[in-house]
C-alpha cells in the first residue's frame, strides 16, 4: 500500500486510477487511465509529478502493486474492493500520526492545493487531475483566493 499511497500523493490520481499509473521519472509525468465520474468514457491522462525529485527519491518507477488495469480490462468491483482495503490499511496509521479522518480523496486534494502553491497553470493542473477547469476552480477556489490575497499583499507591502 506504500507505493500506491506515495504515488497518489506525488501524482494526485483518484484512488482507482492509481492502480493503472505508470510513472515516467525522466519526464516527471505518468500515464494513467482517467475514470471520470458519471457515465463519461475512460481515457488516458498524463499526471504531473509534484515533485519529480520526490518521485525519484521514493523510487516510484519500482512499481509495487498486486493489481493493475488499462483501458481494456478495468474491473470496477475489484478496483473498489482494493481501494477499500487500501483505506483500511491507511486509517489506523493516519490516526497514529494525529490525522483522525483521512480519506483517499484527501491525498488527491492535497496534490491540487500543492499544484496551486507551486504555480502550475490551472488548465494543466485540472488536466493532470482529470477534471474540467470549471470543476478545478470550484474545488480549489478558497486556495486561489488565499494565494491572490498573499500576492496582493506582497505587491503593496514591498
What do these predicted regions represent?
Residues 1-6, 37-38, 78, 145:
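Conserved catalytic core of the tyrosine transesterase superfamily
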Residues 1-15, 19, 108:
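Basic, Lys/Arg- and aromatic-enriched nucleic-acid-binding interface segment
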Residues 17-18, 102-103, 112, 120-130:
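Active-site-proximal segment of tyrosine recombinases
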Amino acid at each position: 500500500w506504500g507505493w500506491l499511497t506515495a504515488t497518489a500523493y506525488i501524482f494526485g490520481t483518484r484512488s482507482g486510477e492509481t492502480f493503472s499509473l505508470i510513472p515516467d521519472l525522466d519526464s516527471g509525468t505518468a500515464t494513467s487511465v482517467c475514470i471520470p465520474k458519471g457515465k463519461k468514457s475512460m481515457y488516458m491522462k498524463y499526471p504531473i509529478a509534484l515533485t519529480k525529485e520526490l518521485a525519484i527519491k521514493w523510487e516510484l518507477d519500482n512499481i509495487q502493486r498486486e493489481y493493475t488495469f488499462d483501458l481494456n480490462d478495468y474491473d470496477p468491483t475489484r478496483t473498489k474492493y482494493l481501494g477499500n482495503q487500501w483505506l483500511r490499511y491507511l486509517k489506523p496509521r493516519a490516526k497514529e500520526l494525529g490525522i483522525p479522518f483521512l480519506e483517499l480523496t484527501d491525498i488527491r486534494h492535497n496534490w491540487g492545493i500543492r499544484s496551486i502553491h507551486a504555480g502550475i497553470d490551472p488548465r494543466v493542473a485540472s488536466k493532470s487531475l482529470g477534471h474540467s477547469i470549471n470543476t478545478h476552480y470550484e474545488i480549489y477556489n478558497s486556495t486561489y483566493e488565499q494565494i491572490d490575497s498573499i500576492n496582493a499583499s506582497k505587491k503593496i507591502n514591498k
